[in-house]
Amino acid sequence: DYIPEIQGFKDITLEMLLNMCSGLDCDGFMKVANIYFSTDLKKLINDYHIDRDPGKEYEYQNVNTLLLCMAIERAIGTDISVFLEKEVWQKAGMSYDATWSVDSKQHNQVKGFCGINAAPIDLAKFGSIYLHDGYYNGNQIIPRQWVRESFCKYNKLKDKDGYYYSYSWRITNANAFVAVGFLGQY
């Protein structure tokens, strides 16, 4: 409902996108490369289609996070990087500005799937927010309930590296969490 111009995805929920179980076909390195190097991500989205029942099978795919970012931007009425700056970066008192890559100057779609370019100290602060139920320096930055739900092992199946996946985090057997991206990005 948030992105009506994209056809064929009406059975996919925001929670499915968060948990990488949308059923979208994204197999192969070429699709990964195409989404990363695309200069028009909104147009590229229409090349994807559902090939499995949404909500049934976990498979990490960048397109899930891209769609999630696009839906969030529609819901909040602003660029997700502006929202992150105001609601997290400023409230937590991060040490340095961060940037988020976009597909092109012409289309300016945030590449939500390939992370935030931030200083290590600020990434550590972000991790600390999650370690402390959404609090940093006594301030509630992220709702406690959201943080707790993030670690509920939504997907009962592990990926090839032995992680569960829940709300954009990888969860280990030791009840630890980590953000690991494509080809070992952290």
Where are these regions (language model features)?
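Active-site Gly/Thr loop motif
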Residues: S95-Y96, S101, V147-Y186
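Active-site helix/loop module of the DD-peptidase/beta-lactamase fold
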Residues: D1-S22, D47-H49, I76-F113, A118
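Alpha-helical scaffold elements that line and support the substrate/ligand-binding pocket
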Residues: D1, L17, I45, Y58-V88, ...
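Extracellular/periplasmic catalytic domains that process cell-envelope and extracellular macromolecules
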Residues: G8-I12, Y36-S38, D51, N117, ...
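Amphipathic alpha-helical interface segments
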Residues: N34-I50, P54
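A conserved catalytic-loop motif detector
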Residues: S128, Y136-F151
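Structural helix-adjacent loops and short alpha-helical linkers that scaffold large soluble proteins
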Residues: G28-F29, E73-E85, G134-I142
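Solvent-exposed loop and edge beta-strand segments that line ligand/cofactor-binding
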Residues: I6-G8, D53-Y60, Q109-N117, V178-Q185
